[in-house]
Amino acid sequence: MTPPRCLLAARSRIPPQGGAPCGLAKPVPRELWKGLWRSAALALLGGFAFSAIAATKVTIAVVSLDGDPRYAPRRMEKAYPGHPTGRAIDGVQLAAEDSAFELDAAGIELVVKDVVLPNAAGLAKALADLKAAKVQHVVADLPAPELRALAQAAPAALGGAIVFNAGLDDDALRGAQCAAHLLHTYPSRAMLADALAQYLAARNWRKALVLQGPLPGDALQAEAFNRAAKRYGLKATSTKPFKLTGDPRERDLGNVRLLTGSDREHEVVAVLDSDGEFARTVPYATQLPRPVVGAAGLVATPWHPLWERNGGPQLSRRFAKDAKRPMTGHDWAAWIAGRAVATVLVDLPKAPIAQQLKALRGGPVAVDGFKGPRLSFRAWDGQLRQPIFLSHVDGVIGVAPLDGVLHPKEVMDTLGFDEAESACRQRP
C-alpha cells in the first residue's frame, strides 16, 4: 500500500520528507527545491514589476455640470423612478475597478478623471485641459444643451474622442441631432416606451387612460408612448391633462380620482410625467382598481438593484458598497460606458481612437452588461442594444424584448428606432 505521505507527494509534486523513498523515484535534494521555489518567486515578482513599469495609462473623463438641476438635493431625496440619484462618476469608477484584472493583463491602466464644469461657459477650458491630458474617452453626465455642445466640440478639441451619453433618453440625440462619435448607453425614450408597450400587449391590457403633464418632457413622452401604442396595438381611451398647482381654480387638474373617474373603459393608467412629482401620487389612488404604468407603478428602466440573474446581485452589491446607495438605471449606464471603454482597450490595445469607435459602433466589440446577452452598439445611431426591465419598487417582473416579439435580424432592435426608421445620418 502506498504510504499517505507518498500520495501527498504525488499530488503536490513535492518529494516526501523522511522515511523510505516512494516507488523507485530518487529523492530530490531539499536545497534544489528551495532554489526552484526561489527562482519561480523571483520570476513572478519580476513579471509584476515589468507589468507595472510597462502599463499604458488611459484616462476616461466623466464630465458633469455644477448645479445640474437633475441633482438638486430635494429631487435626489425623493428618488423618483427613472431619475438619477447620484453622479455618474460612481458607476465609471466601479467599471474601472471591475476591469482592472483584464486591463492589467493587456498592459493598460484605466484612470478615471472627474471634470465638473462650473457653468456651460467652462466647457472650452475643460476641453483644453483634457487635450493636455491626452484624454480621448469621455462619459457625459450633462443636461441636453451642454451635452450637445460637448458632442459638437469634442472631436476637434480632443482628436476624435468618443463621447458616451450615460444619462439622457432624448430621441433627438439618436436622430436628427446625432453625432458620429456620440454613443448612448442610456436607453432612448422610444426604447423605454416600446418595452412598456410590449408588456401591456403581452398582458392584453390594451386600453390605456393617459395622464399627461404640461412640461415639454411630458409631450416628448407622449410622442414616444403614442408611437409605441400604434406599434403594438394599444389604444388610448382618453388623454387627461394634469397639473400640480396651488391655484384653487385648477385644483381638479391634480385630483387623481377626478382625473381617472369619468373614463370607464380603460384597463390601465399610463402616467406621462417627466418631472415625477405628480406620478408618485397616482398608484392606489385611481377611482377604479387599475394598474399604473409609465412614470410610476410599473416602470421601464435599464437597471434595478434587485435584479437577481446574470450576476446582477453581485454588481448591485459592489456598487452599493462603494457609492453608499442603490444602483439605478443611470448608474448602470455610466458603469457600462466604462466597461465599453475597457473592453475595446483590451480587444484592440494598439488601435487608434478612430478604429476603436468603428469597433464599438456596429463593429465586433460587445460588452457584458450583467443582463443576459452581450451588448453591442447600433451602427446607425450609436445606441447600445440592451434588454429593458419592467419593474416596480420591489423588483423586476418582466424583461423586454418579451418572448414572442420577433425581428428579422436582432430581437433587441424591436426596442427603439430600427435602422430604416432612424433619422441619424452621421457615421464614423
Which residue ranges define each predicted feature?
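Extracellular/periplasmic ligand-binding modules, especially the Venus flytrap/periplasmic-binding
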Residues: 92, 308-366
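N-terminal signal peptide c-region/cleavage motif recognized by signal peptidases
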Residues: 49-51
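Short beta-strand elements in bilobed, periplasmic/extracellular small-molecule ligand-binding domains
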Residues: 102-119, 178-181, 230-250
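Short, well-structured alpha-helical segments in soluble
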Residues: 117-136, 251-264
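Solvent-exposed, acidic/polar segments of extracytosolic/periplasmic ligand-binding ectodomains
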Residues: 58, 371-428
